[in-house]
Amino acid sequence: MSSDLILAPQPLINTKASELPSQSGSPPPEIVYPFQFTIASLGVEPTADFVSIAAQAAITAYTSLYRHAILTDLQAIIHPNGYAPAFPTSVALAWVPYNSTATAAKILDVFGGQEFCVGGSINSTSPIIVPCPLTNINPIIKDSVTYTDTPKLLIYSTAPSYSTSATCTLTIRGKVRLHSPLLSSSSS
C-alpha cells in the first residue's frame, strides 16, 4: 500500500452479522471477483444520500449468475482532484447495516461515523480509504434468503458556495466471492 493513502477505519463494536450455517460436504468451486465503481462527484452541491451495496447495478450484473455472493473486502475511497486545494469540501461517511435507521444528515451521531476535510491548504489531498467493518456488517449480499443487514454507506457532503467543479470523487471497491452457478435456460 502506498504511503500517499490515508486509511481511516471505523471503530468496531462487539456484534456479529446474521448468516445461515454452512451445509456439510465439500465446498463448491468459487471465484473472487474484484470490482470498483463511482458513486458520486462531490463538492459542487451539498449531498445527503446512502448506497446499498447489495442493490448496486455494477454488482448485481455479475452476482445474478450465481446463487451465493459474499463480500470479502469493501472500501469507500475519497479521491481528491486538482480543484480540492482551492475549494475544500467536507465529506462524512459511515458504514452501517442496511436496516439501520441512521440518516446521512446525522453521520456523526453514528458510532464510527467520520468527517474529512478534502482539500484546502493544510488538509488532505491524498486518497482517503474507509474500509467497511465486514465483521460487524453482514457480508452476504446474495443467498438462499434475503438479509436486511447488508452493507450500506451513508454519505454527507458540503460544498463551497463558490465552487463550480467537483473537488473529489467517491468510489466503492472490493472483492466478492461467488459460488454455485444459478441454473437457467440457455435459450433466449
Swiss-Prot record:
Please name the InterPro entries in this protein's record: Tymo_coat, Viral_coat
In which domain of life is the source organism classified?
Viruses
- Bilayer-spanning residue ranges: none
Q: What is its main location?
A: virion
SUPFAM superfamilies named among the record's database cross-references: Positive stranded ssRNA viruses
A molecular function GO annotation: structural molecule activity
- Where would one find the signal peptide in this protein? none
Q: Which UniProt keywords apply?
A: Capsid protein, T=3 icosahedral capsid protein, Virion
Please provide one cellular component term from the Gene Ontology annotations of this protein: T=3 icosahedral viral capsid
Provide the protein's localization. Answer: Virion
Name the record gives this protein: Capsid protein
